[in-house]
Swiss-Prot record:
The chain crosses the membrane at residues 113-133, 138-158, 173-193. The keyword Transmembrane applies. This is Ycf20-like protein. GO terms for cellular component: chloroplast; membrane. The keyword Transmembrane applies. It comes from Arabidopsis thaliana. InterPro entries: Uncharacterised_Ycf20 (IPR007572). PANTHER family: PTHR33787, YCF20-LIKE PROTEIN (PTHR33787:SF4). It is a multi-pass membrane protein.
Length: 197
C-alpha cells in the first residue's frame, strides 16, 4: 500500500484585522492519502485561531503617544484600558521608556564631537601624567589646577539652572567641556591603576 503524507506548516503570523483584533494562525496540516484526501483536522480551522478583540499593540521603541489605526488616525494611549497601559506599573514602564528614548535621542546630537572630546581629555590626562612624572617639580601645582578645573566645570554643569544665566551657546560649550572633563578623569583613573600595578 502506497500512502503519501504531505505536511505543510505556516509559521505563527500576527495579523491585524479591522477593529485591531489579533488572529494567530497556529498551524495548518494537509494529509493526502492515495485514495482519501484530508484537507483539515476533524476540528474546524477556527478552533486554532485565537481572537482577542479590542487589543492594541504597544511598540517598545515608539516615542509618540498614539497608535496608528486602520484609517491612519492616532488613538491615545491614555484611553487604552487593556494591555500594558491598564495598570499603574504599565504606565510607569511606558513613561520610563519614553524618558529613556528621549535621553538617547538627545545624546545622539553632536555624538562624534562628544567622543572626540572624551578621547582628547583621556590624552590630556596621559600627557599630564607623563610630563609631570618626568619633572616631579610641578606635581602639586598642576594637580591643584586640574582639580579646580574639574570642580569648576562640574559646578557650571550641574548647578540649578537660572532664568537667563546661560545662553544656548554657552550651555553647549559647558556640556562639551564636561565631556572633556570626563575624559581627563578617566585618564587619571587609568594612570592611577597603572602606577598601582
Amino acid at each position: 500500500m502506497a500512502c503519501q503524507i504531505q505536511a505543510s506548516r505556516v509559521f505563527p503570523v500576527l495579523e491585524i484585522e479591522k477593529g485591531l483584533s489579533f488572529m494567530i494562525n497556529v498551524f495548518h496540516r494537509r494529509i493526502k492519502a492515495s485514495s482519501i484526501t484530508l484537507t483539515s483536522f476533524p476540528y474546524p480551522m477556527k478552533s486554532f485561531q485565537i481572537r482577542r478583540p479590542n487589543r492594541k499593540i504597544a511598540f517598545a521603541l515608539d516615542t509618540g503617544s498614539s497608535i496608528p489605526g486602520d484609517s491612519g488616525e492616532g488613538q491615545e494611549m491614555n484611553g487604552d484600558r487593556t494591555g500594558l497601559g491598564s495598570t499603574r506599573l504599565g504606565r510607569i514602564a511606558i513613561a520610563g521608556g519614553k524618558q529613556l528614548l528621549g535621553k538617547i535621542n538627545s545624546a545622539r546630537k553632536n555624538f562624534p564631537m562628544k567622543i572626540f572630546l572624551l578621547l582628547l581629555g583621556f590624552y590630556t590626562a596621559n600627557a599630564l601624567a607623563t610630563i609631570l612624572g618626568q619633572t616631579g617639580d610641578w606635581d602639586v601645582l598642576v594637580a591643584g589646577i586640574v582639580v579646580a578645573a574639574i570642580e569648576g566645570i562640574g559646578m557650571l554643569m550641574y548647578k540649578k539652572p537660572s532664568s537667563s544665566m546661560f545662553s544656548g551657546k554657552l550651555q553647549s560649550f559647558v556640556v562639551f567641556m564636561n565631556f572633556w572633563k570626563a575624559g581627563v578623569c578617566l585618564g587619571l583613573f587609568v594612570d592611577a591603576f597603572k602606577l598601582g600595578s
